[in-house]
Amino acid sequence: MNLTKLLPAFAAAVVLSACAKDAPEMTKSSAQIAEMQTLPTITDKTVVYSCNKQTVTAVYQFENQEPVAAMVSVGDGIIAKDFTRDKSQNDFTSFVSGDYVWNVDSGLTLDKFDSVVPVNLIQKGKSSDNIIVKNCDVNVKATKKANL
């Protein structure tokens, strides 16, 4: 007796499912796939330095392996959040923000971010430049903690 109630409901479900439109397929064209594969991977890494008994923190932004930007702070004060890579500088990996220049030894990459030391932080002046920090070493313990 329960079969007589169940059979019409089952038949209605079969008929309705046969009438339903096919669901759209989520396919991507080969151009979309190629575009997704060529997009750069953006990664931020923080390095803490000890420079003449001052703590200097740099947050580097990498596109794939290449450094493209940085934010630098000395102690509790942020020098600039918008340092951009100066690719015209061949001697160092150099970043510029207004009249500030952050120079790091050449070879800064995503893989080596925590082993390359800065050369100096300079504020350009009208008649002479002011060296804000120099003689820096990587604070390995603080750098590791900052990137957890």
UniProtKB/Swiss-Prot annotation:
Name of the protein in its database record: Uncharacterized protein HI_0246
Highest taxon listed in the record's lineage: Bacteria
Organism, as annotated: Haemophilus influenzae (strain ATCC 51907 / DSM 11121 / KW20 / Rd)
Keyword Signal tagged: yes
Xref: InterPro entries: UCP020772 (IPR016777)
Key word Signal present: yes
Keywords tagged on the record: Signal
Residues in the signal sequence: 1-20
